[in-house]
Amino acid sequence: MITLEVDLGERSYPIHIGSGLLDNAELLRPHVRGQHAVIVTNETVGPLYAARVEQALAALGKTVRTVTLPDGEAFKHWETLNRIFDALLQAGADRKTTLVALGGGVVGDMTGFAAACYMRGVPFIQMPTTLLAQVDSSVGGKTGINHPLGKNMIGAFHQPNAVIADIDTLRTLPPRELAAGMAEVIKHGAIADADYFAWIERNIQALNACDPELMAVAVQRSCEIKAGVVAQDEREGGLRAILNFGHTFGHAIEAGMGYGAWLHGEAVGCGMVMAADLSHRLGFIDIETLARVRTLTQAAMLPVVAPELGADRYIELMKVDKKAEAGSIKFILLKKLGEAFITSVPDADLRATLAHAVLKPPTEAPVA
């Protein structure tokens, strides 16, 4: 087992990465201080892993309740969130009750938001079971739900007590979900570590096959990068924005196609190619670097061609992005491989990237 730390002073917390961690009651013991625990999972993950976590908590003498949500980005909204609140209230949960997010990014985001809101804040633990959640969304305290007009527009910063990433859970991921997680792995190399990016290039076929040793390396390095950024800028006042590389375009794809048509990681993968194209058009990266981003994204079984929503529709959706200021869209671009920055861009260059990126006619599922 590898243990990292997100250094936030009194609110610092560990990230445990390894095999067989779902059953490890001793990892949970320091972080479940009250008598009651509520596991939040979904219809896919629950039957696979919930009983193991229930048993670990019961071994600590805790009273355990499990809430099972529908699976998918399409359910990341108020109605589903209220299921968590209903369960907490019906169980008589108090301020010492610990929530446990057992699932992917949607479960983690909603459980964290419920923890931030219930009684104005209760503790929670992230137990991510997808690659995307293990390398990205479980770390950093961003929580929230979607709104029909924008992704993750309603939420809060609420740090977990711990992140427990059992890489054994990656073995049960469908290939499409594994690929979606690889988008965030590639992102971390692109924005912060050119050597890591090159390592991913060399090992992409084995990573696609979910080689356990290489996957453990990827989860560790991605968590190191994200934890380092979050420690410097917890609430995204500056540096943390670079973690949104590919997300401005990606969120527009998700909203424009309808939440769930594209997985979040698929939209981010395509968005990274679009952001790299824009970086090249503005003279920051050369054509070879653009080609490397596109080639690696495609090799990870991710889409590199965007749906045709129309340039005006893309721009309308991107103006709702949280990074936008006074209607000005902000993009995370590459200065070079391994270094990113935030900027606004000329409208003509943005429209050129959008025109170059799309495939006609629109597709219901992403095209690699």
Curated annotation (Swiss-Prot):
Database matches in Gene3D superfamilies: 3.40.50.1970, Dehydroquinate synthase-like - alpha domain
CDD domains per UniProt: DHQS (cd08195)
Listed cofactors: Co(2+); Zn(2+); NAD(+)
Note accompanying the cofactor annotation: Binds 1 divalent metal cation per subunit. Can use either Co(2+) or Zn(2+).
Substrates-to-products reaction catalysed: 7-phospho-2-dehydro-3-deoxy-D-arabino-heptonate = 3-dehydroquinate + phosphate
Entry keyword Cell wall biogenesis/degradation: no
Name of a matching Pfam family: DHQ_synthase
One Gene Ontology CC term in the entry: cytoplasm
The keyword Iron appears for this protein: no
GO terms classed as biological process: amino acid biosynthetic process; aromatic amino acid family biosynthetic process; chorismate biosynthetic process
GO terms of molecular function: 3-dehydroquinate synthase activity; metal ion binding; nucleotide binding
Keywords, alphabetical: Amino-acid biosynthesis, Aromatic amino acid biosynthesis, Cobalt, Cytoplasm, Lyase, Metal-binding, NAD, Nucleotide-binding, Zinc
Compartmental location: Cytoplasm
Pathway assignment: Metabolic intermediate biosynthesis; chorismate biosynthesis; chorismate from D-erythrose 4-phosphate and phosphoenolpyruvate: step 2/7
Its biological purpose: Catalyzes the conversion of 3-deoxy-D-arabino-heptulosonate 7-phosphate (DAHP) to dehydroquinate (DHQ).
Family to which this protein belongs: Belongs to the sugar phosphate cyclases superfamily. Dehydroquinate synthase family.
NCBIfam families: aroB (TIGR01357)
HAMAP family: DHQ_synthase
Protein name as it appears in the record: 3-dehydroquinate synthase
